[in-house]
Amino acid sequence: MASIRRTLSPMYHDRSHENGGSHKGFTIGGSSSKHNSSQFLSYLTKLLGVTSDPKSSRRGPWRRPFYQFLVFFLLGFVLGLTPFGKMEDVNGSDRFSFEIKQPYVEERLENRKREEAAVDAVSFVAETENGKKEVNFVPKKLLIVVTPTYNRAMQAYYLNRVAQTLRLVESPVLWIVVEGNVASFETSEILRKTGVMYRHLVCKRNMTSIKDRGVHQRNTALEHIELHKLDGIVYFADDDNIYSLELFQSLRQISRFGTWPVAMLAQSKNKAILEGPVCNGSQVIGWHTNEKSKRLRRFHVDMSGFAFNSTILWDPKRWRRPFSHPTRQLDTVKEGFQETSFIEQVVADESEMEGVPPACSSILNWHLHLDALDVPYPQGWAIQKNLQALITMK
């Protein structure tokens, strides 16, 4: 019977003999660690599928991905439990504290100042070194300008002149224009084009039997201010007067009641007279007067020569006013006494008044009485009756 002998391939010969070296056996003590690491690496490579094992492929294609998933899952779980950051030591007493503590801020930020941000005349200041908040913003007082008007030849000219003056005044300014019976379309058009914040009111009183229409028109404005509790300085500015910008700038300095001298033309139109207070600084000590018929008045002031705080109308307790009835102008008094009768309801005497400007040394407005004739057209231009004439068309 023939025997078959299997010879070793030359590639498995020990290469140390070929080079002339002597063959040495493996020592267990020196290479045990290397042997263990090589076994772990071989097992890991087999598990991860780096080397292909035909026996493992026969067992099932799902085992190798399952073991791979299991190894990476355990590796990620161990890494997730490993603390990489620093943990602050919290005292046991603070663990269940419900107080909200401020975040830690470096000390160098505490001494830092924030610059002021200025916008026009308004400045805002944030926190300073001491931690105090300072606000330099002071809102300006509202100027409530009341102007009664009526239909006449120069009405549009007067209203536009007052409107152009008010446009140059610093805001806030509210222009209250009061008409009688009905608000005319022409007046509404003028007010819309002025560029001034306005309110167009109508006096519902019958003007035919009224002695002074301006009294009731101003009372309509006072009722409106009291109803809506407008907070500001009220000034009666007739449309036929001439005003300076310095006057409106000085009105915001009034705390309760302010007055100033008004220049006007005499009846002869050939000289100017002065009516108003005599002041020592801001204190009123006397009055200018030129008409003998008006010397019996308590206060010698023109209607456009004073202004007052609007809270007097709707908050009398603030000023300790003794009157329980509303503050209004009176139509029952003699002509020329409307001003003094109204002022007596606002203040008791000169000690509650303020002279504007200081020492009352400037003329801030003029009352000229330069009204045109009531007839809007010269004589002969208007015909009382229509001509009853018919012209046949050819």
UniProtKB/Swiss-Prot annotation:
Any GO BP: plant-type secondary cell wall biogenesis
Primary location recorded for the protein, binned into one broad class: Golgi
Segments on the Cytoplasmic side according to the record's topology features: 1-64
Lumenal side: 86-394
GO cellular component, one term: Golgi membrane
MF (Gene Ontology): galactosylgalactosylxylosylprotein 3-beta-glucuronosyltransferase activity; xylosyltransferase activity
Gene3D superfamilies: Spore Coat Polysaccharide Biosynthesis Protein SpsA, Chain A (3.90.550.10)
Species: Arabidopsis thaliana
Tissue spec: Expressed in developing interfascicular fibers and xylem cells in stems and developing secondary xylem in roots.
Protein name (database record): Probable beta-1,4-xylosyltransferase IRX9H
